[in-house]
Structure formats: C-alpha cells, structure tokens
A protein has these predicted regions:
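Beta-rich carbohydrate-recognition and catalytic domains
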Residues: 1-105, 113-159, 163-216, 225-294, ...
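Structural signature of WD-repeat beta-propeller blades
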Residues: 108, 158, 222, 300-302
Length: 338
C-alpha cells in the first residue's frame, strides 16, 4: 500500500450540513472540544450523548503545552436531531469525579443504542493499565448509568447491533494488537454474548488490507442499520504519513486522515460480509474538517439513524473538535454496492 494517498472523494449522494450542529461554546459547563457523539431517537425526541474534553484552549495548548485536565460524557436533546439542543446541566460521567474507581482514568467516545426497550452505552475506557471497551446500561430517565462489562486491554470502538441475532447480543470491536500486527494495523472483529457480560465466539471481520485507501488502522463507528440487503455498517479508516497535514490544527505533528467506509453484513450471520464498498463514503473536505480544530483531517462517525422517510442521518466528530451531520437516502447508499 502507498505510504501517502492522493486526494480522496466521498460519495456524491452524501450531503453535509456546512456548519457544525454542536460546538464547545454551546455547552453550559466547561468545554474545550465536543465531538464523537452517539445519537438515538427516544421517547419522541433525539438524544445525543457526547464526549467533552476540557481544561485548555488552542493558545495554551500550543504555547504552554497545557493538556486537557478532564473528559466528561454529556447529554443533550433535540426535537429534530439538528438544532435546538437542550443540555443537561451537568455531565453524566466525569473523569474528575472524586468518587470514581482509582483504576479508571476516563470514559470517552460514547455510542448509544436501544435494545428491547433498554438503553446501552458503548464506551472507550482508559484505565491505569490499558484501554478497554466497556458496555453500560443507561437509566430510562437518562440520569445514571451502571457498568455491565468491559474487555481486557487493549480494545476500543465497540458498537452493539440494535437487536439480538440468533438469540444473542452481537458487537463489533477493534482490538489493538501492537506486537503482532505492527504499528497501528488494527482490524475489526465480531463477538457474541448471551447477556452482555460474557463475550465469545470471536471472529475476524475486516482487515486494514481489505480497505484500499487505508494504510494504518480501521474500526467500527456506529451501530448498524437493518436493511433488506443486510446490515448497513459504517467503519472508520485511517491513512497516515502525509507530512503536509496538521499545520493549522492544535496538534502540529498530526499526519493522519480519518475517513469513513461502509459494508453490508449478512442479516442472519453478521460475521459474513455481503458486500464492501471499495471507495470512501465520507472524507474530510469542509474547512471545519480540514483547516481548523484540534486535529485536522478527521471525521469520526458514532451514530447512524434511519428515518421513516428513508433519510439516513450520520453524526460524526469533525477534527476532534465539534459535532457535524451528514445525510443520504438509504436507497442511494444501497445502490453504491451494485
């Protein structure tokens, strides 16, 4: 694979809103960056659960090397899933909570899904001894959550399918085998569980080498959507080593580019790929994604919703800085596999 890729283009059926739908200044509590947000439709409105890094700004980060002092998980609601977001007054999880387990450093990159009437979160979980993927249950009133299970290190980017398949919960995940794969060549795996606690029947699903525009790592993004042709599934893909990148962002040495691809998985056995779209679906191409923010050239979806109209909403973090929204018609997305 080439070390540096040429310019990439997203699918023409994708329509991006030109401005972020959520930014740091919108929050009612300290926030430097708000991004990587899970979204569901719940009790007649849209519920977003988002990552918030806080405690510094661009000037202090660049001049003083001051890193972020904390990460929290917050909740907001909207009638249309686009604007008018109403924020809970405080985060539901905060890394500076004095009562948290001392082994835990922080939770981040949340996804949210409803399965059989219960709300579940998938979270990245940084501990003193490695990074884990975690699953928690969120209360019906969205006020509290409890940890159900977490993986051993190192693992991340877990997403749950929105229903049981063959009587089992199913998740996608991205282990990080630094020694065996080399550098960041991390791939997507699938696991099953009877109860969200004990996970097994693990199977390899998609490798970096299967994605023509990736040379670094890939990983799950949002919970899949069930369609007549299979489970519509997004993934992120990373290419790196372009030294021209990162010059306008906070992190000047950032040379990676995050894009999104898609595949169809078998409805009855999602460990089988029905079809893989061989081009990027989403690429960073707007100024908010390429020329500003914490890390340039990053788009990172964490939610995908299918509306009754056939519109698919894709919520994604841009430049690790804000939340953006892209839309497409389901029929147009499925046609890309033909």
């Amino acid at each position: 694979m080439p070390a540096v890729f040429p310019e990439l283009f997203g699918a023409s059926c994708i329509h991006k809103r030109p401005e972020p739908i959520m930014k740091a200044s919108d929050l009612p509590y300290p926030c430097s960056l708000v991004f990587n947000a899970g979204v569901i439709k719940y009790k007649g409105e849209y519920v977003m659960i988002f990552r918030n890094d806080y405690g510094t700004d661009k000037e202090r980060f660049e001049k003083e090397g001051r890193d972020f002092t904390g990460t929290s998980i917050g909740i907001a609601r909207s009638k249309n899933g686009v604007d008018g977001w109403r924020f809970d007054p405080l985060p539901i999880i905060d890394s500076n909570d004095p009562n948290k387990d001392p082994e835990l450093r922080r939770y981040y990159d949340p996804r949210i899904i409803e399965i059989e009437g219960r709300l579940y979160l998938c979270l990245a979980m940084a501990t003193q001894h490695g990074i884990c993927g975690a699953i928690a249950e969120l209360s019906e009133d969205l006020k509290s959550c409890r940890l159900i299970s977490h993986s051993v290190p190192d693992n991340r980017n877990m997403v749950l399918f929105p229903e049981k398949i063959g009587g089992e919960f199913v998740r996608l995940e991205r282990p990080m085998p630094v020694y065996s794969r080399g550098r960041d060549r991390f791939d997507i795996w699938l696991s099953r569980s009877p109860d969200l606690v004990y996970w097994g029947r693990n199977s390899f699903l998609l490798g970096v080498e299967d994605v023509p525009w990736a040379n670094d790592k890939i990983g799950p993004t949002a919970s899949p959507i069930k369609t007549e042709k299979g489970w519509l599934t997004l993934f992120h893909a990373v290419d790196r080593d372009d030294e021209t990148r990162g010059k306008n962002g906070w992190e000047k040495k950032w040379t990676k580019r995050y894009t999104a691809g898609m595949m169809l998985l078998d409805l009855e056995d999602p460990s089988k790929i029905v079809s893989l779209y061989k081009e990027p679906l989403l690429v960073p191409d707007m100024p908010v994604e390429t020329d500003e923010g914490f890390r340039e050239n990053v788009i990172f979806p964490c939610a995908m919703l299918l509306e009754d109209s056939g519109e698919v909403k894709i919520y994604y973090g841009a430049s690790d800085t804000c939340v953006c929204l892209a839309t497409a018609q389901l029929g147009d997305l499925l046609a890309l596999f033909e």
